[in-house]
Swiss-Prot record:
Signal peptide (from-to): 1-16
The species this protein was found in: Ovis aries
Propeptide: 17-30
Superkingdom: Eukaryota
The protein, known as: Decorin
Similarity remark: Belongs to the small leucine-rich proteoglycan (SLRP) family. SLRP class I subfamily.
């Protein structure tokens, strides 16, 4: 029985004719022979549904994310999907942001324009972005901050540009702003208007590192918790420069030319937990550290400190409510470490938290 079935299948295969490639003309002849016209054949094909938003040429689109980075683009692509939430245009050759480049992008939350050649942004370019929260413009050629930024903005990063001025009017109405990054710009203290950041009531983080400023910017908002001013040309810290910063928890002033921290200056930052003053020109430990209730980390290495008093870091006695230090760095100072009293670091959490080392 099995042999009979196999024979039958082989016979069927042997009867099958060879495959013949058919062209459009062959199908037309078949239609003519069968009496079916072209219009009747294609009438049976159901109409296609309208296509959704088209992804720009060479870009990649997925789940409201449009990635157009590293494509050598010289301008913003047209016809971006209106539901885009994140638009990545970094590492291109875009030179200008024009009005209408972001039209209809009412759902955009994040715009990445890092590492282009942008030198001009039209005043109304960001107007359609009514939900924008994060704007990244670092590594471009901007000489000024963009005007009329969306009031929903929470994070602005514009480091490594050519910005020389920060006008107070630029930040007007940006009440949701939390982070501002302006480092590595040719900024001078005279280029930052007094109170330029004051109107941003929720501002928590400012970084203006590696610029030419010589003083701490005035009129900083009391909401600030982190202030990073490393790598500048600041020479002094006085009480007025830190006035009103009651919520400041981290202060970065390393790699400046600071020779003195005036008495009472640190009292204006009662919640300070971390202080970076390494790589400066200090000749003594800043006053007021012993009175700070919360400070836990102090970097003072690579200065000119030649003596350390027994009460420079800790209040008198041992039964205090001061937080214990978790890190104190004093290496690379011309201090005679064997002259330091054993009780000097009585409020340090563990002995290993103190870094002394040799002066070179």
């Amino acid at each position: 029985m099995k042999a009979t079935i196999i024979f039958f299948l082989v016979a069927q295969v042997s009867w099958a004719g060879p495959f013949q490639q058919k062209g459009l003309f062959d199908f037309m002849l078949e239609d003519e022979a069968s009496g079916i016209g072209p219009e009747e054949r294609f009438h049976e094909v159901p109409e296609l549904e309208p296509m959704g938003p088209v992804c720009p040429f060479r870009c990649q689109c997925h789940l409201r994310v449009v990635q157009c980075s590293d494509l050598g683009l010289e301008k913003v692509p047209k016809d971006l999907p209106p539901d885009t939430a994140l638009l990545d245009l970094q590492n291109n050759k875009i030179t200008e942001i024009k009005d209408g480049d972001f039209k209809n992008l009412k759902n955009l939350h994040t715009l990445i324009l890092i590492n282009n050649k942008i030198s001009k942004i039209s005043p109304g370019a960001f107007a359609p972005l009514v939900k924008l929260e994060r704007l990244y413009l670092s590594k471009n050629q901007l000489k000024e901050l963009p005007e009329k930024m969306p009031k929903t903005l929470q994070e602005l990063r514009v480091h490594e540009n050519e910005i020389t001025k920060v006008r107070k009017s630029v930040f007007n109405g940006l009440n949701q702003m939390i982070v501002v990054e302006l480092g590595t710009n040719p900024l001078k203290s005279s280029g930052i208007e007094n109170g330029a950041f004051q109107g941003m009531k929720k501002l928590s983080y400012i970084r203006i590192a590696d610029t030419n400023i010589t003083t701490i910017p005035q009129g900083l908002p009391p909401s600030l918790t982190e202030l990073h001013l490393d790598g500048n040309k600041i020479t002094k810290v006085d009480a007025a420069s830190l006035k009103g910063l009651n919520n400041l928890a981290k202060l970065g002033l390393s790699f400046n030319s600071i020779s003195a921290v005036d008495n009472g200056s640190l009292a204006n930052t009662p919640h300070l937990r971390e202080l970076h003053l390494n790589n400066n020109k200090l000749v003594k430990v800043p006053g007021g550290l012993a009175d700070h209730k919360y400070i836990q980390v102090v970097y003072l290495h690579n200065n000119n400190i030649s003596a350390i008093g027994s009460n420079d870091f800790c209040p008198p006695g041992y039964n205090t409510k001061k937080a214990s230090y978790s890190g104190v760095s004093l290496f690379s100072n011309p201090v005679q470490y064997w002259e330091i009293q054993p009780s000097t670091f009585r409020c340090v959490y563990v002995r290993a938290a103190v870094q002394l080392g040799n002066y070179k």
